[in-house]
């Protein structure tokens, strides 16, 4: 995996289907696209709340070609360092975003997100957005 897709980017892809994002996903597919197991957990929680078989089928279809990165010991150690650094700097980010960013750091992959403002606070994180502001 070279690119880890954040939860909000996946939501944007499924709900709004912006042409530029879909083109980027196709263009980078061979390079290796994946998601964190944290993102998968967020998705499955949302699907359980929606109670929609159609939504669940769409989610599973979207996730099928993506590599799923398990949150392992290296990610846990990166999380501990990152959370401490952000708290000491007075610039914490949300708990799920901290977990996802830490895993991206541990895997040395680029995080693809529509939430650049939040993730820009993470030192050393490779970060891009494949959507225009307002998507």
Give the location of each predicted region.
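Nucleotide phosphate-binding site architecture
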Residues: 10-11, 41-44, 69, 120, ...
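Active-site neighborhoods of divalent-metal-dependent phosphate/nucleic-acid chemistry enzymes
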Residues: 57, 67-114
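Alpha-helix capping/helix-boundary segments
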Residues: 9-10, 39, 75, 100, ...
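A short acidic, often aromatic-flanked loop/helix-cap motif at beta-alpha or helix-coil junctions
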Residues: 41, 74-77, 133-135
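Generic structural signal for small/hydrophobic residues in well-ordered secondary structure
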Residues: 6-7, 21, 43, 79, ...
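Acidic, PIN/NYN-like endoribonuclease modules and their adjacent C-terminal/linker elements
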Residues: 1, 26, 101, 105-135
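Short, well-structured N-terminal submotif of metal-dependent ribonuclease cores
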Residues: 1-35, 45-63, 88-89, 133-135
């Amino acid at each position: 995996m070279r690119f880890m897709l954040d939860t909000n980017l996946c939501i944007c892809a499924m709900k709004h289907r912006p042409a530029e994002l879909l083109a980027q996903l196709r263009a980078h597919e061979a390079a290796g696209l994946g998601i964190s197991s944290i993102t998968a957990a967020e998705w499955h929680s949302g699907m359980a709340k929606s109670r929609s078989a159609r939504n669940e089928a769409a989610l599973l279809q979207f996730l099928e070609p993506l590599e799923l990165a398990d949150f392992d010991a290296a990610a846990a150690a990166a999380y501990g360092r990152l959370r401490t650094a952000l708290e000491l700097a007075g610039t914490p980010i949300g708990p799920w975003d901290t977990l996802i960013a830490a895993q991206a750091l541990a895997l040395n992959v680029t995080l693809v997100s529509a939430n650049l403002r939040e993730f820009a606070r993470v030192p050393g994180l490779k970060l891009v957005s494949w959507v225009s502001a307002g998507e």
